[in-house]
């Protein structure tokens, strides 16, 4: 029997942008308990950002050494409106991936007339861009509409990729015209700090994980062996 724990709060600290009130207060104790029984995977939410990370007890631990994996699922209400798909296969392996809610296909199939639904991806991007443009307008008033739009598009693109757990091309973003406008017009703003935090936190993709059967079985065998060695001689003999 394999146990798959699921919780709201996070097991591991997985964001440079959100550094407080995300991981459990007693996460160290929970990690120790779950790893005692060689649990391979932990699922959580709360952060609203798609993340995957393996716990390492200390720096320098080998990449193939056991450590519980945590998948944080992003909020389906935030573009690109993803949800997670976890397949627990007959061979014992676990495969995780993400899918986006295809609102446009549903809208066409059900003959909806709302153009926002028919082009849901485009509407979602425009919605985020407008939201950021309004925030820019609230803190700076001496930039033209084209500059504001360029800044908003840059922020929105990073925002969507960040929450979706995608790898972000840091160099590409920071050499873009939109980012240049951010540095020039709002160098000390919290929005630029957030933009940089999202870029720095997105150096890899977080949308796929495969835990092969042999990995899971090895971890379970190691736990059973350790449990047997901790038991008394008579108990170990019965096992």
Briefly describe each language-model feature range:
Residues 1-16, 85, 90-103:
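Conserved catalytic scaffold of divalent metal-dependent phosphoesterases
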Residues 79-83:
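Short, surface-exposed coil-to-beta transition loops
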């Amino acid at each position: 029997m394999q146990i798959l724990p699921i919780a709201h709060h996070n097991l591991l600290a997985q964001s440079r942008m959100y550094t407080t009130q995300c991981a459990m207060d007693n996460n160290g104790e929970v990690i120790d308990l779950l790893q005692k029984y060689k649990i391979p995977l932990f699922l959580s939410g709360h952060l609203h950002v798609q993340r995957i990370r393996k716990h390492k007890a200390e720096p320098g631990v080998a990449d193939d050494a056991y450590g519980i994996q945590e998948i944080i699922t992003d909020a389906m209400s935030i573009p690109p409106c993803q949800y997670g798909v976890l397949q627990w296969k007959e061979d014992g392996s676990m495969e995780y991936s993400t899918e986006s809610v295809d609102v446009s296909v549903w809208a066409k199939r059900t003959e909806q007339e709302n153009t926002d639904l028919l082009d849901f991806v485009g509407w979602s991007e425009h919605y985020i861009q407008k939201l950021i443009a309004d925030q820019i307008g609230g803190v700076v008033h001496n930039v033209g509409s084209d500059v504001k739009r360029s800044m908003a598009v840059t922020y929105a693109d990073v925002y969507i990729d960040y929450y979706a757990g995608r790898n972000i091309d840091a160099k590409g973003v920071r050499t873009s015209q939109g980012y240049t406008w951010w540095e020039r017009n709002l160098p000390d703003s919290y929005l630029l700090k957030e933009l940089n935090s999202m870029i720095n936190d997105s150096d890899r993709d977080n949308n796929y994980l495969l835990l092969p059967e042999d990995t899971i079985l090895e971890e379970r065998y190691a736990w059973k062996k350790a449990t047997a060695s901790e038991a008394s001689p008579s108990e170990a003999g019965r096992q």
